[in-house]
Regions:
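A conserved ligand/cofactor-binding region detector
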Residues: 1-195
């Protein structure tokens, strides 16, 4: 209730200030930031990218009455958003690319210099945070690199990803001696007629 709630908030704020002080002391001693940051994690809001093909069990676990209240609140917000969402069903050869969108542009035979009738679709990818015009389209390879780099840097980046930055991040992730492949797990394409 009111007084107890305020008391709980005060205790939480005191714990936060104490954690920050302890983290600052460890930092002054030269302890790695990855270690010192662990102390302040319970008090931080983070950004993350989650990709999945089936959410039913996750929602069953996290919307359950005994679930951690914070994750339950997040799960409820996610469930609400996903219930309102209209998924984009991908076809063979198309890709799930966070931070990159796509255009399906009808291609007609006249585009190729002949008679006008529809022959299919060309898919052009673009950076969702910038200009969506056809002049600024990405190739599939560029879109994959852009998406992977954006996923890799989601926790700290501003909205200033460029293809040059994406290429550098891509090279650090996949062309280094030790491969850091987890950001690539968000890139997906349908497996058709596999089962």
């Amino acid at each position: 209730t009111g007084e107890d709630l305020q008391c709980a908030k005060d205790v939480w704020e005191s714990a936060l200030k104490n954690a920050v002080g302890q983290a600052n002391q460890l930092d002054a001693l030269g302890v790695a930031k990855e270690v010192t940051n662990r102390i302040t994690e319970p008090y931080q809001l983070i950004k993350a990218v989650w990709s999945a093909t089936d959410w039913e069990n996750w929602f069953n676990l996290r919307l359950e009455k005994d679930a951690d209240p914070n994750i339950c609140m997040l799960a409820f917000k996610m469930y609400e958003a996903m219930s309102k969402s209209v998924p984009l069903l991908l076809k063979k050869g198309e890709y799930h690319l966070p931070y990159a969108g796509k255009y399906d542009i009808p291609v007609t035979y006249s585009d190729l210099g002949g008679y006008e009738y529809e022959t299919g679709y060309n898919v052009f990818y673009y950076d969702k945070e910038r200009d969506h015009t056809i002049e600024h389209c990405l190739t599939l390879e560029e879109a994959i690199k852009y998406s992977v780099a954006s996923c890799a840097s989601v926790s700290y980046r501003a909205t200033d990803m460029t293809l040059d930055k994406a290429e550098k991040i891509w090279n650090m992730l996949v062309k280094s001696e030790v491969v850091h492949a987890s950001p690539l797990t968000h890139i997906a394409t349908p497996i058709v007629n596999h089962w």
